[in-house]
Amino acid sequence: MSARRPPRATPTPCPCGLGAEYDACCGRYHRGDAVPPNAEALMRSRYTAYVMGNMDWVRQTWHPSTCPADLLPDTATRWLGLSVKAHSQQDDTHAEVEFVARYKVGGRAWRLHERSRFVREPRAAGEPPVWLYVDGDMIGEAS
């Protein structure tokens, strides 16, 4: 009689679009095992957090000066994909990421095209600086 192997857990692909498994990609940031090394990685992790309804991560990575008080998950939105168009770092503490996020609401498809601004700053005394989302300019949103 042969022993049966326990079923393997099916790896969950990361919604951020890099093609990696969630746990090894954005999941490590969401769990606090790692810090996103640049603004693009942070932006991808924020997109993934929106997909998964992880509003704690979205709030934690939003600069306090611009974070809305009423940040709630949007259960009507179904996120479909992310494409990063550009990532530019102006200096050690400022960067921009241009992206297109595709989504559906009520069966209608939309595209969110944004150029987001990020800053890198310490979260607490003695801790290394982290990237934070500040704001963004909509380049277009069309069906």
Curated annotation (Swiss-Prot):
HAMAP family: UPF0225 (MF_00612). InterPro entries: NTF2-like_dom_sf (IPR032710), SEC_C_motif (IPR004027), UPF0225 (IPR023006), YchJ-like_M (IPR048469). Belongs to the UPF0225 family. It comes from Cupriavidus pinatubonensis (strain JMP 134 / LMG 1197) (Cupriavidus necator (strain JMP 134)). This is UPF0225 protein Reut_A0143.
